[in-house]
Amino acid sequence: MRKVSFVLAAVLAATSLFAARNAPWTKEKAWEWYNAQPWIRGCNYMPASAANRVDQWQELGSEARFAEVECELALAETIGFNALRILVEEQGFGVWLVEHDGFMARFERMLSIMAKHKMRAIVVLGNDCSRPKEIWTLPKPGVQQYDVGYHGGRRRTQHGSFPGAVGYTVLDDPELAPKFYRMCEELLTKYRDDDRILFWNLWNEPGNNNRSPLTCENLRKLFDMAWRIDPKQPLAADIWRVRGQHAEGRSPAEKMAGELSDIISYHCYGNLQMQQQTIQALRARWGRPLVNTEWLARINGDEVFTSYPLFAQNRVGCTCWGFVAGKYQTYEPYESMWADQFTYKRPDAPVTKWYHDLFRPSHHPYDPKEIDVIRRVNAQMDAEREGKSLRAKIAKSCKITGEDMWYGYRRTKFEFKGRKAWVVEPSCTPKKGIPWTWTMQWAEAFVDRTGVPDLLAKGYPHVTLDVFDTRMDENGLKACAEFQDFLVKELGFVKKCNLIGMSWGGFFSTRYAAAYPQNVRRIYLDAPLLNFDGFNAMAIGPWAASAPADGKWTADPRMPVNLAPQVVKGDIPVLLLYGGQDQTVPPASNAELFAARFKAAGGRIDVEKRGGFGHHPHGVDPNKTARIVNFVTTAK
């Protein structure tokens, strides 16, 4: 302990040289720092063989554990992670107290391995996830016990096992509390200028386990210390219970965390809608960069497929909970979730899914599709930073007008030669050559019934261009051909597209395919308008100026019902669905006439007449889109 005291004395002497501050960074400085970083993404990390954070930091078994860390961080590097949230808190403090020099050496070694694999540390010091005093013991090095089959390796955890109880921590012990602060001071001082530290997450979930009245004073004390040391990295404490407009959390401790933080670290384990609402609420309230330092709860609907692209789209940093499944067992549900099953509070909760974690002990993914999404989104964000992303390519020649999430996928809106256009990117790796789909009209209608989201999930980008004012006359054809040329030459899409034509979109698709058969691979038509007979002049736009003298469009060679042979000549297969009771676009003079002529010309056409259907709804039930998807993805 004399050596520890000597080290701490040196630390205290060093801190007196620092230029202290007494408030959070300005918002401008916070954003300047954040914008200088790549998109932050990673996980909360503990080696799979560690039963808890005592195991993570203690001498016992450390050599084997560091070999494991090397393998696991190499795995994290392959999927594009660049940050790890590592918790020291009171379990690490228990090691620091007994094995001070060894702890500091192992902390340094951890940072070095992380840097080797291109990752930086988010370091957690305080923690309010705790259990009542009656069962609390000071964490100590040695063999760590754990219960098999329980979240966190404990039968009785801080996650709902003690409702109403106040958690107990080392900061409640008058002898241990000063020593805990010394540990924090030593780490903050030693690494205040170290680029391997991304930021200091000073407190995990302040106010959890009913500790808010106790934590406010401690939280302020730790921030005051950190301000005196003034590291070059930002400081943050977690807001972890954001609900709707409650962007300050639900306790004084959380509100204080937001008020003291340079950047906002928050936790959200909710579904896509809740994630979106949380981001909006936090941005509106705090106006600072956001990092969701805990997410991924499949049982709650917090999925990689939806949340991860959302964070990227909104430039919100994120670290999921868990990496390789191990002794800590956070892939298991909370015990309270099992109780909800047995008492029928949440009988439909999918508790057989993994709750957290990404990889199995074998290092095979829990779900390979999740890892593909993570890799793809990471690559997209890195490419964007380098000016090589799809969005960046679009921005070279077009004005970006907006970005959003469209059915869980990133959509970039832009102007193409004065017309509204957008491209939706798949989150997974695109198919070789980037095959794609194009809804030519009504691109926002009946989307989940058209198979488009399913095709995005398979790696097919989706696009549209607004040419409705032309009703696909010669000007519309030219505009679409120029748009496709842009997509192929500038964005790397394959030469031939898969067209989706609902109602007016059927008119557009067939005319385009007949004019540019070399540009079209397949067409899915749904209740298509293929003939103007029965339409008034107001509906057909510029076509009214060239209407047949007798008003009969069926014989007009420009009508799609008369273009079937040209489409067949282009060897373009067609899937045609229509309603037998369609009063808007009568089948006899549209779908059925086209189908008959298409077949007569020797074309490949799959027709389904749905006798009880009218013009709407287009598409098929969302759980029956396989027919459309298979049609588009079939090789020939």
Language-model features: where?
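C-terminal catalytic histidine-bearing segment of alpha/beta-hydrolase fold enzymes
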Residues: 327-346, 351-353, 358-363, 367-371, ...
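The feature captures the conserved acid-bearing segment of alpha/beta-hydrolase catalytic domains
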Residues: 275-282, 533-540, 544-599
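Active-site mouth of glycoside hydrolases
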Residues: 22-261, 285, 295, 299, ...
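Alpha/beta-hydrolase active-site loop
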Residues: 178-182, 471-492, 511
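Short amphipathic alpha-helix adjacent to the substrate-entry channel of hydrolases
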Residues: 446-463
